[in-house]
Amino acid sequence: MIHDERIRSLNTEKPARDGKYVIYWMQASVRAHWNHALEYAIETANSLHKPLIVIFGLTDEFPNANSRHYRFLIEGLRDVGDALMKRGARLVVENERPPSAVMRYSDEASAVVVDRGYLDIQKEWVDELAESLHVPLMQVESNVIVPVETASPKEEYSAGTFRPKITRELERFMVPLKERRLAVDSLDLDPGPDLNDVTGKFRASEELEPSIFSGGASEAIRLFDEFLSEKLACFEKYRNDPVKNCLSNMSPYLHFGHISPLYLAMKASKTGECPEFLEELIVRRELSMNFVHYSDNYSSIRCLPEWAQKTLMEHARDPKEYEYTLREFEEARTHDPYWNAAQKEMVITGKMHGYMRMYWGKKILEWTDHPERAYDIAIYLNDKYEIDGRDPNGFTGVAWCFGKHDRAWAEREIFGKVRYMNDRGLERKFRIGEYVRRVQELEE
């Protein structure tokens, strides 16, 4: 089922009856599996008795993206290209800005369907295309369980204010997505270059070592099945423990749209009680979409609530026992072995344990000469090294370290009223030395 709330008309144009095909502009939901935008595009193509082509614009202009991110993305494109072919739709990848790639094929299109992203650049691309197209542009939301505006009409203060609003919508939106069949396939069309030619020639502006994860829906499904059978039982108890191997590792796949959050939620729910997993997947993740969608400053310290900005600036010049530069942070050259291990884990694997990411961000605030510079450093490092950097979850995670979605605590130096974390807490809660040793083994 595709609820009306997922669908938005972005212009007032009428379908071109003499067009050769319908276009699905795939950008945020790179999958053929449980993808509302794709299924809506198939419905549209069938209603017009047209084939469907799927277009992806592979641009090197995406802010802060590097070879690590593009390698993961391209693996997903190859996976989805094969999956689409089995369903009778051809994937066209053009090495250019996404709206330009779609416009290149729009003269012979009857209609265009696009999925939905929440970052500023994704909104700008869609607005640009909407102003240029002479056929209908429909946007279908598929990367959240509850559509963002349905969950809440405003930016929420915290998980506590957001949770009851999204929870009361879950029963309505937690329904399976039926896979449609294309009436007319596009496999005989030859509208664009070969996928392997385009991806093989693509070069990112910044080279980075690949992460340990491979992209694509097939790999995401395999990892999630492994999580359900081997890790879910310990997730509820040990999800915050960086020593335990209990996480789903779905965040990179959710970021690139290689897996559906609805699919994950419904499959996990069938295995039994998993409230903490659903809390993270639904409440916490979709709170991050709420934040990025409604905030004008989601990548800046100006996104923080007034009390957090005020208290941090009041303590901006407090004396600091340790102070580091961006380069020292990036190279994991601090006095703290736990922080260094977290940074190295991110650099080596492309993913840092969630609990350590909180500690990591708090310490950047504590050891930088000014909170605004600390914020920028945390965003920069997260965006550069995390496979799921440049993502609502990442922006929200950094913001939380500085007071977003949290309350004021007892005032102290440097942090003011922002929540504090220290190494003694790690030592008290976890066998943190084992975490450090495990990261050292990764280095070797």
From Swiss-Prot:
Species in which this protein is naturally found: Methanothermobacter marburgensis (strain ATCC BAA-927 / DSM 2133 / JCM 14651 / NBRC 100331 / OCM 82 / Marburg)
Co-factor binding details: Binds 1 FAD. The FAD is in its reduced state.
Protein name (Swiss-Prot/TrEMBL): Deoxyribodipyrimidine photo-lyase
Keywords for this protein: Chromophore, DNA damage, DNA repair, DNA-binding, FAD, Flavoprotein, Lyase
A Pfam family annotated for this UniProt entry: DNA_photolyase
UniProt gene name: phr
Enzyme Commission number, as recorded: 4.1.99.3
Catalyzed reaction equations: cyclobutadipyrimidine (in DNA) = 2 pyrimidine residues (in DNA)
Family annotation (InterPro entries): Crypto/Photolyase_FAD-like_sf, Crypto/Photolyase_N_sf, DNA_photolyase_2, DNA_photolyase_2_CS, DNA_photolyase_N, Photolyase_Class-2, Rossmann-like_a/b/a_fold
Cofactor(s) annotated in UniProt: FAD; coenzyme F420-(gamma-Glu)n
UniProt-listed GO biological process terms: photoreactive repair
Family, similarity comment: Belongs to the DNA photolyase class-2 family.
Residue intervals of the Photolyase/cryptochrome alpha/beta domain: 20-148
Residues at which DNA binds: R239
Physiological role: Involved in repair of UV radiation-induced DNA damage. Catalyzes the light-dependent monomerization (300-600 nm) of cyclobutyl pyrimidine dimers (in cis-syn configuration), which are formed between adjacent bases on the same DNA strand upon exposure to ultraviolet radiation.
Molecular function terms, GO-annotated: deoxyribodipyrimidine photo-lyase activity; DNA binding
Taxonomy of the source species: Archaea, Methanobacteriati, Methanobacteriota, Methanomada group, Methanobacteria
Domain of life: Archaea
